[in-house]
Amino acid sequence: MTAPHTSANDRVIIFDTTLRDGEQCPGATMTFEEKLEVASLLDSMGVDVIEAGFPIASDGDFEAVHEIAKRAKNAVICGLSRAGAKDIDRCAEAIKPAKQGRIHTFLSTSPVHMKYKLQMDAAQVYELVISSVTRARNHTDNVEWSSEDGTRTEFDFLCKCVEAAIKAGASTINIPDTVGYSVPEEYYDLFKRVRENVPNSDKAIFSVHCHDDLGMAVANSLAGIRGGARQIECTVNGIGERAGNTALEEVVMAMKVRNDKLPYWNKIDTTMLTRASKVVSAATSFPVQYNKAIVGRNAFAHESGIHQDGMLKNAETYEIMLPESVGVKQTSLVMGKHSGRHAFIHKLEEMGYKLGQNQLEDAFVRFKALADRKKDIYDEDIEALVDLEIAQSHDRIKLVSLTVIAGTHGPQRATMKLDVDGQTKIEEAEGNGPVDAVFNCIKALVPHVAKLELYQVHAVTEGTDAQAEVSVRLSHEGRSVTSRASDPDTLVASAKAYLGALNKIVMKRQRDMAAPAAAAS
């Protein structure tokens, strides 16, 4: 927890929108179960407000928000809504089970948005601000209003809309830098001036929401806080549309490490930041770049001889924060084929995993199989293995075995055995290379029209026996799904990743088919 100050005026509310704005990032779609896991972790680590989704967008989004609202223990559960009555009412229904619920309604206010997107004039927009907030306020006393494209909105009109929204009952006012256009000095000045010019500004909490199109989302968010905002809207790993959103882990640690210049506090348990990063990365199949601040693999790694020498003498020579403060251990416990079940369970608990008995047994079997093929097992290996086990626990299509014949001459041929809904299927296929042969096998065993958009491979750890981690993105009916899998055998990892994406498509189709039936009953 980052709380050296006790003044309520210095407290910053952390509003996480990983499950809403983050999931809007192309290819970052999460399953229902993955959303519940991410929400549970965010709740546990001290996030104040979880924006769980956009209920009107789909039945799946509604169900996820509704279920998260049921399960949340501490966080306010928020749903996003446009300004229309149907949107607001649907959002209210979704958050109804929450101990603390919030409706977040928004409306564009910039000249370019009003003219081309809304095709409305300023007077119409102003009236809609009032009516939408009033309707939301009839459902809950916790209403947030956002001025979409607020940083490109004419200042006087922005102040007029903010004043009206507060008067209509909004307790939080968000002025987002929707297109990532602002610079810190400008964003600081905007909040300072709005708060000075809106007569009832003291009756609401002001919020920042920044995008990273110019690489300044974190800097702008902190500038907005200095300008008087007291809520930061952010996502784990900074995922989001286009270049992404403000990274939760970065703003939280900036306030903690540089509290001398940023004298604010929040309730986040920073030791859970790395775990949150890994869970979101696994759920979205978006790898975290190695040099990512705070949670990147190299954030606490030192290879230069000069740096290593300094670190050995005193860690403060090159580290401005302790690795343990963000949940990173300085040393990795190396495990191998002689490690037993007890040691494995202890290691999982140490790493923050909580598995069911069946998942635990399956993960241990996978671990022992990996240990027989790999000399040393590192934390990264175990994370990759367990994340795959969690992802596959709901799969309807599972890989049983794979044999590939490849070489410099002759065709590349793959033979694959799959378990499809409990039924074993075997097929052989050729391809232009071993990976193509593997994917052709899958297409023969499970006929589908999904298109391969992305295929990437990188090593989980170092060495010739390192596990390969493969990312596969498939597009189906205008929707992209991404999956990752790891294995010492690159071709096996490729098959698992492709099947993982295919399983997501199957689960999505199954949920879409179930929704009308549930509504009819």
Swiss-Prot record:
UniProt-listed Enzyme Commission number(s): 2.3.3.13
This protein's pathway: Amino-acid biosynthesis; L-leucine biosynthesis; L-leucine from 3-methyl-2-oxobutanoate: step 1/4
Binding-site residues for Mn(2+), renumbered to this chain: D21, H209, H211, N245
Class in the EC hierarchy, top level: transferase
Cofactor(s) the record lists: Mn(2+)
What's the domain of life for this entry?
Bacteria
Region spans: Regulatory domain: 398-521
Q: Which PROSITE patterns match?
A: AIPM_HOMOCIT_SYNTH_1 (PS00815), AIPM_HOMOCIT_SYNTH_2 (PS00816), PYR_CT (PS50991)
Q: Which Gene Ontology terms of cellular component type are present? A: cytosol
One Pfam family linked to the record: HCS_D2
The main place the protein resides is cytoplasm
Similarity section: Belongs to the alpha-IPM synthase/homocitrate synthase family. LeuA type 1 subfamily.
Function (record text): Catalyzes the condensation of the acetyl group of acetyl-CoA with 3-methyl-2-oxobutanoate (2-ketoisovalerate) to form 3-carboxy-3-hydroxy-4-methylpentanoate (2-isopropylmalate).
Kindly provide the name given to this protein in its UniProt entry.
2-isopropylmalate synthase
